[in-house]
Amino acid sequence: MKISDGNWLIQPGLNLIHPLQVFEVEQQDNEMVVYAAPRDVRERTWQLDTPLFTLRFFSPQEGIVGVRIEHFQGALNNGPHYPLNILQDVKVTIENTERYAEFKSGNLSARVSKGEFWSLDFLRNGERITGSQVKNNGYVQDTNNQRNYMFERLDLGVGETVYGLGERFTALVRNGQTVETWNRDGGTSTEQAYKNIPFYMTNRGYGVLVNHPQCVSFEVGSEKVSKVQFSVESEYLEYFVIDGPTPKAVLDRYTRFTGRPALPPAWSFGLWLTTSFTTNYDEATVNSFIDGMAERNLPLHVFHFDCFWMKAFQWCDFEWDPLTFPDPEGMIRRLKAKGLKICVWINPYIGQKSPVFKELQEKGYLLKRPDGSLWQWDKWQPGLAIYDFTNPDACKWYADKLKGLVAMGVDCFKTDFGERIPTDVQWFDGSDPQKMHNHYAYIYNELVWNVLKDTVGEEEAVLFASSASVGAQKFPVHWGGDCYANYESMAESLRGGLSIGLSGFGFWSHDIGGFENTAPAHVYKRWCAFGLLSSHSRLHGSKSYRVPWAYDDESCDVVRFFTQLKCRMMPYLYREAARANARGTPMMRAMMMEFPDDPACDYLDRQYMLGDNVMVAPVFTEAGDVQFYLPEGRWTHLWHNDELDGSRWHKQQHGFLSLPVYVRDNTLLALGNNDQRPDYVWHEGTAFHLFNLQDGHEAVCEVPATDGSVIFTLKAARTGNTITVTGAGEAKNWTLCLRNVVKVNGLQDGSQAESEQGLVVKPQGNALTITL
């Protein structure tokens, strides 16, 4: 919401009350409580007829400082509430002096001044990183609509850039944007978002989570150009400042607090193909797609059935359409015999035409209006109603239907929708409708996730989810929603993926080739390269199929090349996936996250790091022209082998079987020996590639098992012209390629052979000594 009108005025109809003077400071257990008045209250006569703000400072985890600013404490505070991991007895330090009161957790502290002018400062090791000054937080009375709000404005320094706030398709840097965290089904070409997360971070190395599930209004360097303002309709405002000091460290703390991304199964990193949305399909159509992929030597790993696996107008009652799929169990059995995993589409709604609608209504499993009638409308499905997942019996009914599908052979679910949740309703458990609007996405996906966890096991559970709220990163994978089939939407999708990664989500995908309309072949091929260098890769469309031969023969070559490349990269990719699970660092990440000390990376949103070591710059033009930036160092193309200097921009032109994919120096990269499947034994026949190891540096490569644990570690250390290579753990028949090295002066404990990319060394055991 807009509060100010320029620099000196406020918006018409608003009355503002600010904390201006500290009246008293108390320590209550592990909390620091500050009572602050909106005027000078040193005289007793001034202590009457005045509000008094209560500010509570606390720490749910080390390095996180919570702030709760309260006006009236008697207001209703119905749930839902974010599922936060709050630890007891976090070590804190409270200091109360004549000049200030300070609360400290880890290296982060909040300091409230006691002088004539109010200030709230957040400091890292005594150095201010942000805060709010006089009249920059408080209480807003809106006489236009008789509503009350709380707000805070945190300072932005010169050159400070803001990121996150969920999966947003606008410019990656949020500065200058107004953001309302209200989930909407708006596609990728608008300011609306499927996944609103009231959490942002900045390039100063801290993050802020606003702990309110309802709509939070952000003015990010917009209303006040040097401040992030956030406001919420409430009698209190609670937020957490999360210390870094690096972007990765911020996400480590944030996901430890809100939940780590689960580790998806290895097979989910392969290629997914769908029926598309409103296309005509039956078992014969499905078989023609799958057989066509096999005939063209196109690896395929997951097949997805979209909405029309069920009868029209009856979604979602979980019954296969008997006219289109008369033998679903037999069909699934036949598909799985071809080595495929099976995914089906679901949503949390039910059409009135469904035979089970009356049962659901009578049992009270559907969302109601305050007068007791069902909430219904005719959008999406005629007479559509919404499952009330605050009713445990409704959850059990829904879960039992899903378990029946799993028993039939379904491996995973595309959990679509969950954004357009109304507020003129009465939830079974009395939840606040304003808070449940966004949080519904969490309980919906949690329910489906738990079904898979209980049936196939957590190590095999995976979703393809559309909507999300805080904590939903625990239920991967998420995808970017409905995009157009053009380069602009391809770029929008990438911005959304980088944005959600900066909001705590480890795994992300998008509709390769675009969802709406049908892409020209050149767009499809460029998008395939981008999509198969994403954490998860799915071919999906709306009114047309996405099989590559529907475009041209070269599209088959592109899909084959990049699918095989991704399969070979799985030892590297799955280790990065395990790190996302352990630390919250997204697999696909903005350049500023990997290179926070390089200011040239702050605004980059057309390229990304795929893990710690590989830079990818998708091509957004038919001719193949692309510009990209490489940070400091010496970079090598993953398969072309050309080398480029960093700290500069580069301009190239690429064919459809290529794009800029550069590996940073001092990298030891593991490639597997299987280009047909993602799920294989990665520590057998592994080809390690050593890129530009500099004197005095060590490169380390950890090869994972399918549970994410490290099964083999290879290290290469260089001193002068000598490289010492040592392995630990279990590995068979591994080799080492010295990229762009054509010969060496000495080799101990191994043999050598030439290759186009560099000298290939085969060890006799698990150790080598190489003299350059």
Predicted regions and their residues:
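A low-complexity, Ser/Thr/Gly/Pro-enriched, surface-exposed linker/loop concept
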Residues: K2-E43, D49-R99, V140
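Catalytic and substrate-binding clefts that recognize carbohydrates or anionic sugar/phosphate headgroups
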Residues: K2-S4, N15, Q47, E70-F72, ...
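Short, well-ordered beta-strand segments enriched in hydrophobic/aromatic residues
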Residues: V34-A36, F57, I69, E102-N107, ...
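Beta-sheet entry/capping signal
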Residues: I64-V65, S109, S119, P198-F199, ...
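Aromatic- and carboxylate-enriched substrate-binding clefts and catalytic-loop regions
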Residues: E70-F72, H81, P299-V559, E594-D598, ...
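Solvent-exposed beta-strand/loop surfaces of large extracellular or lumenal domains
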Residues: N77-T93, K368, L638-F656, G746-G765
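A conserved hydrophobic secondary-structure block that centers on an alpha-helix together
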Residues: S189-T190, P264, T275-F325
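Catalytic core of carbohydrate-active enzymes
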Residues: W449-V462, A468-W479, E492-G496, I500-H510, ...
